[in-house]
């Protein structure tokens, strides 16, 4: 039942559009935890932990019993208290941490087995999580513990759908970074899903009914994946052209090859047949000049015409590359800055308004609504990553021979250098916005915090899109999931520092976030290390390209032709 890669390529626009919608409704919905928390309290989850003393109503007149009504309150007829808040937040902490920690094995599995099975599993887990929450709401006094399992499944299923959607942009060629940014933007904007559901809930809809319908919609995701997603992983645009698919039984081997593999192998056969018998003794020298082994038969053609090992670095080589290490530093610093603000936002607003809960609720709602900006702003960074790639040439392929006019025409940009240049601009721009966000956080002005909300939302969409675009541009497509999972795991572990920072702000600093924000602003300067390294890396690539062109000119001058293979 699974379609082929060629069929999936024809359906790529349908798959991309539905993936954006599915990410918006089913991926990182746990980021809207504040709205879900209110609904869980209204349904009585862990309300049994709140015990109302018998003498509360009789002693509220006395001064000694005044704190009691502040600790116990009624939400939709259910008791709410501090113990309930703590246990529900513990459930959220467990679910969100498992969500981040599982990204690395999830990426490795996806790179090995492809996205189809993981997406089917993720949609099923999300549906089960909705049904578990609904079942727990039917009898919260006995089934509240199900919220732990439900949130873990919710986060796991959402991350499965997010990760698998990041492979779809491989089918869009030079627009790959733009589509990666669109997928990440829809993932980041999914924080508005629970606030939207809360509006339906406040309008009078049944909480259990909403969750059952939501689980049914997740079932539609399952069937969409079942009928449209192929078994094979999506290769990168540099690895395959989906428009060519031929069975080469007449060449002596029966497997199917596509795209550049087709071009490489047929071109090699043509060159082999065009070489005279006097040239055959020098075949090894010709192979060295060409940069890959010359195949002498259909058996050699099938076995030996493989990409050079240097062209596809190993996973460990990619992990210890300076580019990945600096991207991890940038991501860790940015994640800590963003997550601390999300966790401490209510406390920061309370400090600014001196405890006015209505104002805090208003600004919290504004912050939640602004999360949709991620869907609009994330593709901007993807467009920066894809800037002028269509005007570039791929130096990994042999240039076509141009007689007479080669020196007159302006040389095209090198694709790899343009990718590095675009990534440098994207990370520099993102870090400037991050520093600007840190500066606005230092100013104790309430209306200015709306501008901080906007910067926070933009940076959150930009940083994920920039990292995803960088990994897709620099590293092999078969390592994309593993490297993205490693980045998510490391940044999630580093982001755990937000808890001691929050305790320091609420304890010794008396709720004043000034010094914590100063420290985080200073740490944000580390984010400029990556664009500075990319500048040096670009210069290195430019020197290599210049040397290659000089060698090509020298060879042309000696032999009178740009075709090296004619002079073995």
UniProtKB/Swiss-Prot annotation:
Reaction(s) the record says it catalyses: L-phenylalanine(in) = L-phenylalanine(out); L-leucine(in) = L-leucine(out); L-isoleucine(in) = L-isoleucine(out); L-methionine(in) = L-methionine(out)
Primary role: Uniporter that mediates the transport of the stereospecific L-phenylalanine, L-methionine and L-branched-chain amino acids, between the extracellular space and the cytoplasm and may control the transepithelial (re)absorption of neutral amino acid in kidney and small intestine. Transport activity is mediated through facilitated diffusion and is sodium ions-, chloride ions- and pH-independent.
Residue ranges, annotated region (Disordered): 395-415
Molecular function (Gene Ontology), one example: L-phenylalanine transmembrane transporter activity
Transmembrane spans: 20-40, 90-110, 120-140, 143-163, 177-197, 207-227, 319-341, 365-385, 434-454, 461-481, 489-509, 515-535
Family the entry assigns: Belongs to the SLC43A transporter (TC 2.A.1.44) family.
A single BP term in Gene Ontology: L-amino acid transport
Membrane topology: Multi-pass membrane protein
Keyword Transmembrane included in the entry's annotation: yes
Provenance organism: Mus musculus
Compartments it resides in: Cell membrane; Basolateral cell membrane
Modification after translation (UniProt): Glycosylated.
Positions glycosylated per UniProt: 55
Primary localization class, coarse: membrane
GO CC list: basolateral plasma membrane; plasma membrane
Regulation: Affinity and transport activity are regulated by a phosphorylation switch state at Ser-274 and Ser-297; increasing of affinity and amino acid transport activity via dephosphorylation at Ser-274 and phosphorylation at Ser-297.
Keyword set, alphabetical order: Cell membrane, Glycoprotein, Membrane, Phosphoprotein, Transmembrane, Transmembrane helix
Presence of the UniProt keyword Coiled coil in the record: no
Reported phenotype of the disruption mutant: Homozygous knockout fetuses mice for SLC43A2 display a reduced intrauterine growth not leading to a prenatal lethality. In addition, fetuses mice show a marked reduction in the concentration of almost all amino acids in the amniotic fluid. Pups show growth defect, metabolic alterations and early postnatal lethality.
Residue ranges with Basic and acidic residues bias: 402-415
Domain of life the protein comes from: Eukaryota
InterPro entries associated with the record: MFS (IPR011701), MFS_trans_sf (IPR036259)
Induction section of the entry: Regulated by protein diet.
Name under which the protein is recorded: Large neutral amino acids transporter small subunit 4
Tissues expressing this chain: Expressed in intestine, kidney, brain and adipose tissue, heart and testis. In the kidney, is detected in epithelial cells of the distal tubule and collecting duct. In the intestine, is expressed mainly in crypt cells of the intestinal microvilli and epithelial cells in the base of the villus. Expressed in small intestine enterocytes, the kidney proximal tubule, thick ascending limb and, to a minor extent, of distal convoluted tubule epithelial cells.
